[in-house]
Swiss-Prot record:
This is Acetaldehyde dehydrogenase. The active site is at 131 (acyl-thioester intermediate). Its EC number is 1.2.1.10. CDD domains: ALDH_C. NAD(+) binds at residues 162-170, 273. GO terms for molecular function: acetaldehyde dehydrogenase (acetylating) activity; NAD binding. SMART domains: Semialdhyde_dh. Belongs to the acetaldehyde dehydrogenase family. It catalyses: acetaldehyde + NAD(+) + CoA = acetyl-CoA + NADH + H(+). Keywords: Aromatic hydrocarbons catabolism, NAD, Oxidoreductase. InterPro entries: Acetaldehyde_dehydrogenase, Acetylaldehyde_DH_C, NAD(P)-bd_dom_sf, Semialdehyde_DH_NAD-bd.
Length: 307
């Protein structure tokens, strides 16, 4: 029996296509289905070229095939507005859901900070926050594990060309979801998130600024060491995650300046915001697959599959 979990990707846009390209190299996840709503979409055509089965009838077009193709995990890269219904339909069939939209109906997952907690409990839906969240929350957590953080603020700057229509429709959800995760995962008592979409040509690489206000005077050596250790953890799945400057200390304010370069799988390397999202989502799926293969956690039983 293959150790790979068979996967469906919902949403054939920038994120979904990049995810497929990464999955094709994965030892733990096998992409089988790509789900879209437009029969003419480039993303569905590309998925077929990669050898995936496709449907243009949304998740409803996938449901009849879930059991026969043994789909065990789905990655939703559509929109916050449709995710809840997609997740409900697939969870009912025993499919784990990794949510790459800002819907956040499941618990937030930022792999280097809290992935292990989720895997131990087999959450049926985990939310990958946002690209800005994946890039910045590890840094907030790096500070808050040293000493309490009263306030965390992040500014994610991404190139206009790297974000598709789904992300543009979800800007408000992006800021709310990221701010919530700065608090719940990052450990700040209060969080704020800002996204800047830069139309400059040639496109600029993703840049992220993280400001933390500590409750007491910052322990500069301990925070600096913690930040560097956390960067090394993120680089295990996003090699282009780099410290540009910092940590810079000004009174109780700690400022960290990051740059994220992508692998250039689907979009060029400037779209590090895509890469950090898809790489984190795949890392999450792979961790579930590893734990299932080792017998640490059990997949839900499927009555129909046993009949």
């Amino acid at each position: 029996m293959s150790k790979k979990l068979k996967a469906a990707i919902i949403g054939p846009g920038n994120i979904g296509t990049d995810l497929v390209m990464k999955m094709l190299r994965s030892e733990w996840i096998e992409p089988v289905w790509m789900v879209g709503i437009d029969p003419e979409s480039d993303g569905l055509k590309r998925a077929r070229e990669f050898g995936l089965k496709t449907t243009a009838e949304g998740v409803d077009g996938l449901l009849p095939h879930v059991l026969e193709d043994d789909i065990r995990i789905a990655f939703d890269a559509t929109s916050a507005y449709v995710h809840a219904e997609n997740s409900r339909k697939l969870n009912e069939l025993g499919v784990l859901m990794v949510d790459l939209t800002p819907a956040a109906i499941g618990p937030y997952c930022v792999p280097p900070v809290n992935l292990k907690q989720h895997v131990g409990t087999l959450e049926m839906n985990v939310n990958m926050v946002t690209c800005g969240g994946q890039a910045t929350i590890p840094m907030v957590a790096a500070v808050s594990r040293v000493q309490p953080v009263a306030y965390g603020e992040i500014v994610a700057t991404v190139s206009s060309r790297s974000i598709g229509p789904g992300t543009r429709k979800n800007i408000d959800e992006f800021t709310r979801t990221t701010a919530g995760a700065i608090e719940q995962v990052g450990g700040a008592k209060e969080g704020k998130a800002i996204i800047v979409v830069n139309p400059a040509e040639p496109p600029l690489m993703m840049r992220d600024t993280i400001h933390c206000l500590t409750e007491t005077e910052p322990d500069q050596d301990a925070i600096t060491a913690s930040v560097h250790a956390m960067i090394a953890e993120v680089q295990k799945y996003v090699p282009g995650y780099r410290l540009k400057n910092g940590p810079v200390f000004d009174g109780n304010r700690v400022s960290i300046f990051m740059e994220v370069e992508g692998l250039g799988d689907y979009l060029p390397k400037y779209a590090g915001n895509l890469d950090i999202m898809t790489a984190a989502a795949l890392r999450t799926g792979e961790m579930f697959a590893e734990e299932i293969a080792s017998g640490t956690i059990q997949l839900p039983r499927r009555e129909a599959a046993l009949a």
